Amino acid sequence: PANEDGSYKFDKNALHIWPRGRFMMIALANEDGSFTCTLFMPHEGDKFAFDKLNSPESVNTFFKTVFPDFYEMVPTVAEAWDDHPLSNLAIIRCSPWTNGKVALMGDAAHATVPFYGQGMNAGFEDCTVLSNLMKKHDENWEAIFEEYSRERKPDGDALQDLSLDNYYVMRDYVSDPEFLLRKKIEAKFSELYPKKWLPLYSQVTFSNIRYSVAYQQGKKQSDIMDIIMQIPNIENVWDSETVMNEMKVLSKDFNF
């Protein structure tokens, strides 16, 4: 909930994450000063799972133990628990996307988990690609659908892979000091040489780079960062000229 004066308890312009390894909770700001919090966790089979939160006492114990700072802000969480039913996350991966006069678009073709926030954008991209192909092929719908499916299917698959990968980042890696150092190095190098390095998140979220291309470039960047992280004393020399020059050599094939 909001503060008594209606202000936000924490930064309204940030995604807030409580990473816990196998699960996590996130919070996003609402316009009234409150936050919508979502708990992503296995339904069953884990030490911490939804099937174990089956009473007000178990809910309170869980949040007191696992998210004590959240519980301090929302001590009434158990009272609201049953008003927020569980739902499932799913991926739809299918082929072909077209048949006769029918074409799948948006979630019908490539529904994905929400951890990159790109589901709607991907649907709009489908529309843009299809619109351009309609202009290219005029009324030849067979050619339109054939090229649409051939062009978009790899991007739909890549977005799903990216979204799943980012779930692991959010629930686990963001609390890993080595991972955070990798991101600091990437950000520093990208600031110095924006044409040689665009972080994967920026490729996906803030550019028109195809998801399939971003996914492959992200893999190459990860391999480069594995090499950089092996530099002796990297935690103390991460922003040095030596490290930046090594990054420049390793990223010579990139041109953003």
Q: How does the language model describe each region?
A:
Residues 105-107, 125:
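Active-site flanking residues adjacent to catalytic metal/cofactor-binding acidic residues
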Residues 116-133:
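A short alpha/beta connector and helix-capping loop motif
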